[in-house]
Every structure is written in structure tokens, then in C-alpha cells.
């Protein structure tokens, strides 16, 4: 059977009837003649011509991208969907991506405008001059307190020449006239790499270093100090000036401040293994908790048993973080000692820290969970504060914050501790009040721990305190002579912190701006009297020999003496009197010598000495190094055997404390600042050595170097200066040996020999050298005082004004 193939033109079979084929062709011809009927040769479906008069599709169909039958008033699609059918306008289809991009661009533009406005506002605030009352005198000239020619401006208050008003070192009165110095800063605004600014005030470590930078810059570019041969020689030698300018450019704190970003892994806080906690517990109690008594030994042991037996959910996170912090603090202390003694445990201890710090990151990322008013939160926050300052990439929680994180985190945790303490009512007395320090309840003990930590934070950041003794009904207690030695040391230390509160309020706070010269001098005299009363009260404690079985307490005794020396520096540096300025060099030098004595030989350092050394650098402002460095620059003594060597040794001892894995830690940044100071001293010393070889430096007769050639003081000046505080220290080497860098042959048994007088007390020139001058009677007005105290020579003893506040004295002596 033969298949039929269709005709391509007509689609009819080839063997079809011819008559039918002809009829088909005729129909095709007729259709081709008509333009309205498309040809069947086109395979596409014929389309009708659109009606130009028809309306466009409705908006709903256009949005849904479906065919619209354009029926009025409602198309069939909208009728079935029961939605409004709108033919009013024909909107364009919205590009969602483009719309989001435009919206984001608008937000970015607004943020740029806000950022520019904030930057301009910061500049205006820095340049803005404080308003003056109509009755306030307008000074005619403003001195620069950060770089004046006289040594007094290094550490004293700011005083306009035509006014007697006296200001604190960190707050300056800017003249309203046009000839004022616009470069005088109101504190140091620090820019952070993550954005934002923060004010660091005097005497924060960064503020001290920037103060030295401003002082050197001023002397190199503007004013040469009058009477300073050092800077006159440098100004005359372009090569020397270029060397100092190059060293000045190496200042390490000129850029943005790098604060680590705390990132949590959003996992719950984990409990550390109990065996690691038990291994660390003894070291924590003996070397950390003994100075900062956060926990009672027995109660801490019971808490450990309860937590690991029940793992209660109520306070589980708080105790888990507390135990983690105890391990971190102990492991960090062991790691420092291991590095110094070249032990094989170095890598093991260092490798353990990051894993434990993850728990701290989780806690710091959500700090609010530990702000509920309860004692355990106070304790855990205290342990976290300790770690923040030493390792800033991280007292227990506050202690950890101080060790491993930045200063901003440290201050944040400190403020959280004080807030929880006030919410818990630690500053209020509860129950019967005991007058003995050794019978103090737990709540009161925790209050004093938080109180002392708050005073340390105030001087380390220059910011006001959060807890004040006048706002608390808890007062100092007396500690009996038969109380345990650590309790007596702790009581003396807390007593000194109450004096620190008065020092900050009267000399370093914003309130001190309103004080006149006479008021400021009176405040200095009162605080100096309070320090001498403290010295008299605790002289036996400072001079007590340490038994061999209590050898770990000897560094704590040295720390208490160091605290007393730093306190003297903090007071005397605010006095413009020249004799007072000369006097306070001795406690500054003695403070650095105490650091050297605690550090000793690094290869034989112990856990107790290392813990005390860390507290010396961490808990106290580094004003001694700053002021001795300033004296070297002012007086032209950068190569003096004593001051320059002490600064170099202090930096060497600081290298024991910082970790290479945490370059942004407090100790690491502090070491960088001290390195810049020592490099600057070495540069000046090198310039003077070359100048001495060339014959441009030194006395005309060539008998001695110009650095030590001075006019001897008159007998009246010598009689007004109290005895050298060095005589009160029984350090294991003599003063001459220390100045020459010699090592002692036989260490002394006690830290203070009973034959020496108390700090700051004058002794009689006749008779037994151990009898203070006030005991000799005669014309000494101090005989009428009880307890007797040494009166500074510049203080008129016959003045009708009291030497110190009677109410404050009665409260601290009760």
C-alpha cells in the first residue's frame, strides 16, 4: 500500500481529486487577495488587531503578571480573587533590589552627616572656653601646666599669673582672651579604632605619657626652659634637635587606641574540671585572696562541694565563672614565674589560658546576667575585674578583667561591681557593729574590697569614684596587735585607701577647680598630716621583722610601704612650693627602689613576689616614674646614676609581667610607654656625651660634668627639708650600693629596723637617735599634739587654722 504524502503548499494529499484541489487553490487565492485574512502559509496563530480604543490592563493583573480581559468595572481575575480592580493609572513595576539599594544609600549618607557633625562638635568642645561668672577674675595670661619652664608645672596645679586660683593637674583654666594657648588640652580624648572617644584624665598612665610628650614637644618647638643648660645646648645643636625630634616621632600612643572586641560563641558558661580548681585553690588563697579577701577559706570550700555535687541552676553560671577565674589567675601567676625561671611549664600554662578565657568572653558579652543584687554576683564580678587590665585581648571577675582585657572593659566591670554592691546594700551596716577588724562580717569585708578597688580605678583612669565613705555608715575598725599579720596589713591598706579618697576629692577631682591657692595649700597640708598620722599608727607594722615561716608576707609588707610612698608623691606633686617639690623626689626614688627590691633576681622570683610586683604596677599610678623622668628633662640629669638607672630597672622588671600573646594588655602597653621613656633618656645622654667630647657642655674649668654641677643649698633650705626617707627603709642594700648598682652581700633580716625612725618624722640630733624630735620637748610645737606628728617646715605652726580636718581625723583614728 502506497503512503500518501501531503502537499507542502496546501496540506492535501497528492492523489486527491483534481476538482477538490482546484477548489482549494481558488479559496487560497481569494484569501490572499484579502489583506485582513492572513495567509495559511504562516505557521503562527493568527492574531487579531488590537483595539486602540480598549483600556489597558488593570493594576492588579499587571502586578501579578497575568492576562487581563479588561472588563469594566472589574475584570474577571479581580472578580474571582475578590480584590479591588483599578484602571485609574498605569504604575511602573517596582524594582525591589534597586529600591533597597537607594534606601541603604540614603541611610549611609545620613550616617556620614551625623559623623561629620559629631567630629565638628568634638572640635568645638575642645576649643570651647568655659564660662566665667561675672565676679570671677579674668587672668591676663595662661601658663601651660603640661610644659611650663619651671619644675613646678610638671606635677603641680595650674595657676594663672594674675590670679591666685589653683587648679588640679588634670583640669586647666583656659583664658577667655584671644592670646590664650589653644593647645592646652582638657584631659586626653582617646579615639578608638572601633569608633567613639573616651576621656582619660590625670593621672592615668596614658595621660602621664602624653604629658611627657607635650612637654618635650614644647621645649623643642616653642619655649626653652629658663636656666636649663641641657635644652639650651640642644637648641644650639641642630643635630641634637633632629635626634630628639626623631625619637619624639616614635611616641607609641599617637594613633587610635586598639581595644579588643569581645566576641561570644553563644555557648553557656561551662564549669571547669574540679581537679584543676583544687590544684589552683591553694595558690589563689595564699597569693591573691590574702591581699584581696573576696572569699573566706572555709566558705569557699563549702561552695565548691555544693556546686560540684548539685550543679544548681540558680547560681550555677556565677559559681562556674568564679571557679574559672580562680584557675585563670593562678595559672597566669604560675606562667609568669615559669617564664622568669626558665621552667618547662611555660608553654603548658600559656596554652591553657585561651581555653579558659572563652568563659570570660561569654560572661563579658552578656554582663547584665550578673548584675542581680546578690553577694555571689559581687564576688564573681570582683574576680573578673582583676583579669581585664593585664590581658586586654581579655576583683574575681573584676580581677580577671584587669588581667586579660582592656581598660575600657576593666572600668565597665568595676562600675558594674559598684552598682551591684550598692543595690545589695553593702555600704549599709547590718546587725551589731563590732569594733574589731578581725571580727568583721562577710558583707562588710566585701564592701572594703569593692571600696579599695574603686579607689584604684579612680587613679588609674582619672575618673571620679563610684563609692564614697561619707555616703556609707560603715566606718573603719581598729585591728589589734595580736591579730593575724595579713589582717593587720589589710587594715592598714584599707585605711590608706580612705586617705586616697580625700586626695582625689581635694587635689584631683573637678571640685578642686574652684580652690584658690590658699585653699589648695591648706588641703595639701591636711593630707600631709593625715599621711603622717597613718605612718605613726602603722609604724610598728611596717618595721616588724618577718618570721621565716611567714616569708611570703614580706613582699606584702613592702607593697604597703610602696603604697605609702606613692601617696606622698600624689600629695606633694600638687604643691607649688619649691621646697615641697624638692622633698618629694625622695619618696619617688624610694618607690622605684622598692619595686626593684620586690623583683630581685628574676631567676629566683617566687609566686608571692611576682604577685606583689604585679599589684605594684597594676594598682598604683606610675607617678614616680613620670616625675623622675620630668626632673631629668627639667634639670638636665638624664645620665644621673640614680634616676636614669631606676627608670631603666623599672622597665626591666615590668617585662616579667606582660604576655607576648596579648600585645594590647595593660602591662604590655605600659612596657611600651616605659621603653619610649628610656629610649628618650638614652638619646639625650648620647647627645650630651657627644657635646662633652666636643667641649660644648660642662663647666669652664672642666672639673666635673655640667649635669652634677649645682649651687649648694643654703643652711636655711637644708633645715626646712625633712630627713631623707631612705633612712627609714632597711632595704637589703645601702644607698650607695643601690646608686652604684652593687648587689648586697648579706640580706637584712627585717624590712625595717626598729632603730630607724618612722617615715617623715624628724629625729633629735642629740642623744639616742631613735628618739623622735617631738619627744625631746623644747620649742617643738608638735609636743602638744597627741598622737605626735611631723609638721612640714613651710606650714606655720602658730596658724589658727587646723592642720587637717578634725572630723575626718576622728573618723579614721576611731
UniProtKB/Swiss-Prot annotation:
Keywords: DNA-binding, Metal-binding, Nucleus, Transcription, Transcription regulation, Zinc. Signal peptide: none annotated. It is found in: Nucleus. Residues 58-85 bind DNA. InterPro entries: AtrR-like, Transcription_factor_dom_fun, Zn2-C6_fun-type_DNA-bd_sf, Zn2Cys6_DnaBD. Residues 16-27, 49-59 have a biased composition (Polar residues). Its main location: nucleus. One of its GO terms (biological process) is DNA-templated transcription. Residues 713-723 have a biased composition (Low complexity). Residues 1-59, 699-723 are annotated as: Disordered. Transcription factor that regulates the expression of the gene cluster that mediates the biosynthesis of oryzines, natural products with an unusual maleidride backbone. This is Transcription factor oryO.
